[in-house]
């Protein structure tokens, strides 16, 4: 049973027996706070919400980067302010509202969460280089982390390369972990990201340093961001292209998992993914590496509609029929991906897989494929051209919305006219030859002494109708 006593109610209970008393004692006990080791004896953090006078003026000067005012106030010993003064930017009133809300749910929170920072952190996060230099000259500790992050973490996450340089020269540790187990190298973002990363590496940051929980390296993060230049920089500094995180993901897997945010970004997203994958493969990344769920780069590239990446991976000889932990092949992933992937031309992905020996879709699933991908008639075309007959029920026409039927009238008229009807002799010859070459299709077809047009026909070239 969940106890919901407040500290006052606990004190009123007297001395209950057993576990209840122990729990009550723990509730009223002052909790340990990791930040207290950073505070001077007898002093607590300065609450910004209640600050006034020189303290408030000092805080505002740091925020705007007014180095003159910061210097003047620090020079006045009567203010009691120091370069390492700790400020609490949290809102106690907001906590009180939250506390009363959770009490209504029969829960109890003993203390509110402090949000601690120092002038050094604020200056670093806002790019105030002169204020930063002043504070460091006045003996501010570069690795102070009352809130769980150092000033170097803040400067890197904001992409302020000049501040990163100042802190590193002052002796900041480039490999220290923040409260989330991340190093400065993992947090680099913003316009100065490349310069920040290079500075960290020059000052001894571990190029393959891992995060504490996920065990991700900076190269994993560069791949997830789709940042080709950052990945290239890390690889030139010796980053391992096949390093795995705690779930078995390699940077190549992370790159193939890049998702398109909107149809307008489809081309740019696929291009970034392609450039990243080509870069990683060029330095020896395993094109067929699988994570803990047995997902391979080809599964992910197919699921997200990265057709150029699919071609690249297939050219490396990856298995077009490998199954993930759920029993899905790359072709399944391509057809199970979001229908918004139509902007990525899924028909090219499906055709490339089939031309590299992918096992065809079970005929009984074709109505579901038609229902899902009817807005991409070329995807339907390339699938249907791998069967000797159109294996659809007569009522399948009802699966296609009228507006799609009207838009692609020529193709869908030819499709439904062939339901339970014989296909052309030309098509049957294609099926027979492809079946005969099964297992060596991608290597054998290009070697056949055939005219280019006939070769394209055998490789399921798009014609926008069926016969």
From Swiss-Prot:
A GO cellular component annotation in the UniProt record: nucleus
Specify where it is mainly localized.
nucleus
The residue ranges crossing the membrane are: none
Q: Which SMART domains match?
A: ANK (SM00248), SOCS (SM00253), SOCS_box (SM00969)
Q: What is known of its domains?
A: The SOCS box domain mediates the interaction with the Elongin BC complex, an adapter module in different E3 ubiquitin-protein ligase complexes.
- Subcellular location as annotated: Nucleus; Cytoplasm
One matching Pfam family, short form?
Ank_2
- Organism field: Mus musculus
The organism sits in which domain of life? Eukaryota
Keywords, A to Z, come to: ANK repeat, Cytoplasm, Nucleus, Repeat, Ubl conjugation pathway
Spans of the ANK repeats are 115-144, 147-176, 180-209, 214-243, 247-289, 293-322, 326-361
Where does the SOCS box domain start and stop, copy by copy? 412-467
The protein in question is named Ankyrin repeat and SOCS box protein 10
State the organism's lineage: Eukaryota, Metazoa, Chordata, Craniata, Vertebrata
Function according to Swiss-Prot or TrEMBL: May be a substrate-recognition component of a SCF-like ECS (Elongin-Cullin-SOCS-box protein) E3 ubiquitin-protein ligase complex which mediates the ubiquitination and subsequent proteasomal degradation of target proteins.
Annotated metabolic or biological route of this protein = Protein modification; protein ubiquitination
Q: What's a GO biological-process term for it?
A: intracellular signal transduction
What family, per the record? Belongs to the ankyrin SOCS box (ASB) family.
